[in-house]
């Protein structure tokens, strides 16, 4: 049984171990069957009671068997239980324990906060296991390896390089799938991340630097690959399943919300998403196919303006902006870039979460029920909101326009940052809240870069220096992403059915 849907075979580059590893990761999703190991993986899942959700089930939980739903009624959202694989969906009931499924979790930020005519709606990652949607990308990367028999959990560890939530999601999904894991992330990430990872991953490796120091993470991956035989590295920045999960799952979730909240004259004015690994941008590709008039904008920290200026630098918006262009970023679908000063999210997380800030928002006319939910926005979520506001103002969007964005995680991962800000700047009082509310109301259209065709190609070409020169990927694939983009990206999107078929066959044998 062979499912081989690779569109572009990569040619040898003569760069030895480094080239071999990163070339392997750059293939379209390899669905070749390794029968002997696949049988072992089936037996292991049978012993541990593990079943895998299909993409169709993650997109539409009504397809999930009632027996699984019954089990979930006695399982907490973050519990280490294999049935929580079926909570890798946007449709989880917003409950900490025993929740079922419902509509997509989202927040519409009121105009009293945004100051825009357009409506701004953000999907909320808080109600995924681990409190962030990155479990979706992690599952999409590891599950094909298990169902094809390419990964042996008895001899290999899954390595999850990340600037935050992806390695958390990877460590968690690895535990649910009974696979040992290694998490790699910068040393300056929030304390909550490290404390939680120590309870979940077999190894936690801190690399030098802050949010934007992804090069040091890549260097550690290369070192591990050279010195250890027990690791398989799932690099979110070049893993095509990361893009595919958001195209096939997150994009339809946005469409579902639009159908629910939009009126007869409503339009999707745009999608505004920050680029960490560029995985979520796959949802933008889906939305642009469904709503051809929609634009896709990419937010980045002004302190690290890679798209805006070919720039670099450190910043404080955890989860985005890593001084390079991810391999899985489809610039053919990207229409604009929006710079966000990292000082603003640090101010606005206080405005949204401190009592004085919430009072100021309510006094300004914001619905108290929505203000209560603003803790669903973590630092990068606030950054996305800022970018969405600037986008809506730049394009002069009106009352019939809806702008979608992403609230990847919540403030549960950043309470230490609030404490640090209080220690650094003093208690948050009404005077400071009023200042920050004025800053929010005064957001302008500075650092919004509307991209021409040539601008898009220029940004795409920046991949060369990271992925071809440094990491040994093949130049022909880089060119195919741009020159033959319909077949390249369309071929990837077309793999969902074959992958679901493999998962269904795998589960059927587990249940025998």
Q: Where do the language-model regions lie?
A:
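Short, Lys/Arg-enriched N-terminal segments with co-localized hydrophobic residues
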Residues: 13-27
